[in-house]
């Protein structure tokens, strides 16, 4: 979590850890708009690990994003009580690495899970870094899952948008066969992934999409993966859309269309006055408020209003 330092002595570290990655991510999105796209057609069905947003561009952007992610450190995750390593083998036989935070009671004793929560990460995050953020769901009696995208952390495969979307569709389908209540949580790039999964017709009970781009077709990707094109009246009321007025990674022009279409179709929405990009909020208090909004929607289906 990025928190603004209390003293000037920590400002350099804060800039390196929080500000610099933010600038680099934003620059990479601009690069997507500037690079030439490889020819593609929306009707073409590419191979799983084919590039769909430009052969050079997609490879370079994912390479850049992956370099911003920390090195994998399983001990960081497995040092937490209730966390175990898990893996998922995709349809093209790539093994994705992740973690499960097992459902437990207030004393930490394992309990029969009520359902599951699956988180799809932002582009510079890895699973062992973020599994702790799902502890509240395990404590509420749900198994919480998080995976490294293919080509990230300890996961096999090439870093490709098309493959990542298909991976998560398969993961959700597998989890749906094992649990009663089904909850999805996507941040930034992960929000785009989850909207595509939802658009494929999978069952889910509640979802939160935090700061996802409305479209990727403006950057040379096929319109079939635009999150806004997967939003329908049937699914919108089950999805909470969160954006932030202080987001310097994906601004209003990137996120507004998806949020406003969601609201028009009956989705609860939040455009937080003090929210930045997910996990880049300036204070712990702001981040905690955001986390509680996510938790309330996923666990209780509490309807929230624009602020």
Question: How does the language model describe each region?
Answer:
Residues 158-177:
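Alpha/beta-hydrolase active-site loop
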Residues 39-89, 97:
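An N-terminal hydrophobic leader/cap segment in hydrolases
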Residues 123-135:
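The serine-hydrolase catalytic nucleophile loop
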Residues 212, 217-263, 271:
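The feature captures the conserved acid-bearing segment of alpha/beta-hydrolase catalytic domains
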Residues 138-154:
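Conserved alpha/beta-hydrolase
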Residues 186-194:
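Gly/Ala-rich beta-loop-alpha elbow adjacent to hydrolase catalytic centers
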């Amino acid at each position: 979590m990025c928190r603004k330092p209390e003293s000037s002595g920590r400002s350099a570290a804060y800039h390196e850890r929080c500000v610099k990655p933010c600038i680099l991510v934003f620059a990479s999105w601009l690069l997507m708009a500037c690079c030439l796209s490889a020819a593609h057609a929306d009707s073409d069905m590419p191979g799983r690990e084919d590039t769909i947003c430009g052969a050079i561009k997609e490879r370079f952007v994912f390479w850049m994003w992956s370099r911003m992610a920390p090195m994998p450190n399983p001990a960081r995750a497995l040092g937490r009580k209730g966390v175990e390593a898990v893996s998922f083998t995709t349809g093209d036989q790539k093994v994705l690495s992740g973690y499960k935070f097992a459902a437990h009671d207030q004393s930490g004793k394992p309990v029969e899970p009520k359902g599951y929560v699956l988180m799809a990460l932002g582009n510079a995050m890895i699973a062992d870094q973020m599994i702790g953020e799902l502890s509240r769901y395990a404590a509420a009696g749900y198994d919480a899952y998080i995976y490294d995208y293919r080509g990230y952390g300890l996961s096999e495969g090439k870093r490709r948008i098309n493959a990542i979307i298909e991976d998560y569709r398969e993961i959700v389908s597998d989890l749906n066969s094992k649990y009663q209540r089904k909850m999805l949580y996507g941040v930034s790039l992960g929000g785009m992934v989850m909207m595509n999964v939802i658009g494929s017709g999978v069952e889910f009970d509640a979802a939160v999409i935090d700061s996802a781009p409305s479209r990727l077709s403006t950057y040379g990707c096929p319109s079939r993966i635009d999150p806004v094109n997967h939003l329908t009246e049937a699914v919108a009321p089950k999805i909470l859309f969160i954006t932030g007025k202080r987001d310097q990674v994906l601004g209003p022009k990137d996120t507004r269309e998806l949020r406003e279409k969601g609201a028009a179709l009956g989705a609860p929405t939040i455009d937080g006055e003090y929210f930045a990009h997910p996990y880049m909020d300036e204070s712990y208090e702001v981040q905690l408020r955001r986390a509680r909004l996510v938790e309330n929607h996923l666990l209780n289906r509490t309807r929230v209003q624009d602020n």
